[in-house]
Curated annotation (Swiss-Prot):
InterPro entries: Ribosomal_uL10 (IPR001790), Ribosomal_uL10-like_sf (IPR043141), Ribosomal_uL10_bac (IPR022973), Ribosomal_uL10_bac_type (IPR047865), Ribosomal_uL10_CS_bac (IPR002363)
Record text on subunit structure and interactions: Part of the ribosomal stalk of the 50S ribosomal subunit. The N-terminus interacts with L11 and the large rRNA to form the base of the stalk. The C-terminus forms an elongated spine to which L12 dimers bind in a sequential fashion forming a multimeric L10(L12)X complex.
Name of this protein: Large ribosomal subunit protein uL10
Gene that produces this protein: rplJ
Keyword terms: Ribonucleoprotein, Ribosomal protein, RNA-binding, rRNA-binding
Keyword hit for Heme: no
PROSITE patterns: RIBOSOMAL_L10
Function: Forms part of the ribosomal stalk, playing a central role in the interaction of the ribosome with GTP-bound translation factors.
A family per Pfam: Ribosomal_L10
Single GO biological process annotation from the record: translation
Source organism (scientific name): Bartonella henselae (strain ATCC 49882 / DSM 28221 / CCUG 30454 / Houston 1)
GO CC field: large ribosomal subunit
PANTHER family in alphabetical order: 39S RIBOSOMAL PROTEIN L10, MITOCHONDRIAL
Amino acid sequence: MNRAEKREFVTWLNEAFRKSGSVIVAHYSGLTVSQMNDLRSKMSEAGGAIKVAKNRLAKIALQGTESESIVDLFSGQTLIAYSEDPITAPKVAVDFAKTNDKFVILGGSMGATSLSVDAVKSLASLPSLNELRAKLVGMISTPATRIAQVVNAPAGQVVRVIGAYAQEGKAA
């Protein structure tokens, strides 16, 4: 990479950090190419991304962002997992770490808040924004459905009574 490419990469990475709801830093030393590809595909399916960058360039890209506090995590072979949804990157990273001992989560950030390894694991156990939205819509729509059922119940009862009288009249 020449200077111009590095500058462009740092600008791109800085923008990615700014747009991210959460950033996770992990060691990946010893993972095979197929394991890395598996991690990348799982992360992209969930709506996040994985980036391997030189530590020096990542530290420069973090300057001026809310995630600047995690600069100290960048040592050794590190990768960056990030997503706009604050829950996606931690959830995928923690799930992947459960099955791959060589993938070690170092920490991360959510906005201006630095996250320890335990905080990342706790964050991963929360439902995603889409799951929360679905639950909220369900909670809002359930009372409306019940009100509609209560309002329609008397009309349904009247129809059944009239139907019963009609059946009686035919039988007689």
